[in-house]
């Protein structure tokens, strides 16, 4: 259990509660969760964060009516800056998007601008939105994370409770290496409903070599851990920085979609450009 799982800031969320679906535009459906909930226990201060980054969302179930009442469909790409006061709670995002279904908009740009304005207001931070017609994306192959996969190690695991102990002395030697490690075994659980969240993670670093067995055991220990996607990525970044002390570090996770949305957070203390192609499970 996370230390803030029962925080009063979470009491008003629709997540985990029976909810009516609305199909006429309603910006009030959006709900934010303070980023400070998980940052404070990690001693991450808003004015001195050790990373930059964004939460990248893909919107697969986005539809509205044009001015003549003809349904329109699009795939949306949203980037929410890491400095925003709030992250966007995903069920509320889904309900909000559903409210577009029977609402008329004069243009695609009006939809994009509405999304951008509402998300900025909810997150209290910078948000960018792009909308794509389906024929712009058709035929795109599934992407893959560049790097060395650490999943096929011949080890025995019998403990799935989250622990940073696995990272103790995980970085050794004096030689500085620069490598990218990948795992598809990341699984955590929703902070509120405890439903499973499945993801792939890419860790790029420069520093003393990180023991791959210890890293894998650490990642697997998230299996019973309850936190939102964004919070897990910040925790992983913070733990690796604390225990392994790399000179450069980037952590990027791409999670499978739920409710027509996927969330793909990244955090970095160096130049990093995340590849945004969907992975095979997305």
Curated annotation (Swiss-Prot):
Its EC number is 1.7.1.13. Coiled coil: none annotated. Substrate binds at residues 88-90, 229-230. GO terms for biological process: queuosine biosynthetic process; tRNA modification. GO terms for molecular function: preQ1 synthase activity. It is an enzyme of class 1 (oxidoreductase). NADPH binds at residues 90-91, 258-259. The active site is at residues 190, 197. Catalyzes the NADPH-dependent reduction of 7-cyano-7-deazaguanine (preQ0) to 7-aminomethyl-7-deazaguanine (preQ1). Homodimer. This is NADPH-dependent 7-cyano-7-deazaguanine reductase. The gene is queF.
């Amino acid at each position: 259990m996370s230390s803030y799982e029962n925080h009063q800031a979470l009491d008003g969320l629709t997540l985990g509660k029976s909810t009516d679906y609305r199909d006429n535009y309603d910006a009030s459906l959006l709900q934010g969760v303070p980023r400070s909930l998980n940052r404070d226990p990690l001693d991450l201060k808003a004015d001195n964060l050790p990373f930059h980054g964004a939460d990248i969302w893909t919107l697969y179930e986005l539809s509205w009516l044009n001015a003549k009442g003809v349904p329109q469909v699009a795939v949306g790409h949203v980037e929410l800056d890491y400095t925003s006061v709030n992250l966007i709670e995903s069920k509320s995002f889904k309900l909000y998007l559903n409210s577009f279904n029977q609402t008329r908009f004069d243009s695609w740009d009006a939809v994009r601008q509405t999304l951008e304005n509402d998300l900025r207001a909810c997150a209290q931070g910078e948000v960018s939105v792009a909308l794509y017609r389906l024929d712009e994306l058709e035929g795109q192959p599934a992407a893959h994370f560049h790097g060395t996969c650490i999943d096929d190690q011949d080890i025995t695991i019998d403990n799935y409770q989250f622990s940073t102990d696995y990272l103790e002395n995980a970085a050794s030697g004096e030689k500085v290496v620069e490598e990218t490690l990948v795992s598809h075994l990341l699984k955590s659980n929703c902070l509120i409903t405890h439903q499973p969240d499945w993801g792939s993670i890419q860790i790029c670093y420069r520093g003393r070599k990180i023991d791959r067995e210890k890293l894998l055991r650490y990642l697997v220990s998230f299996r019973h851990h309850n936190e939102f996607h964004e919070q897990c990525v910040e925790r992983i970044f913070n733990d690796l920085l604390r225990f392994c002390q790399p000179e450069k570090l980037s952590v990027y996770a791409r999670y499978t979609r739920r409710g027509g949305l996927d969330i793909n957070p990244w955090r970095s203390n160096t130049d990093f450009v995340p590849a945004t192609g969907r992975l095979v499970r997305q």
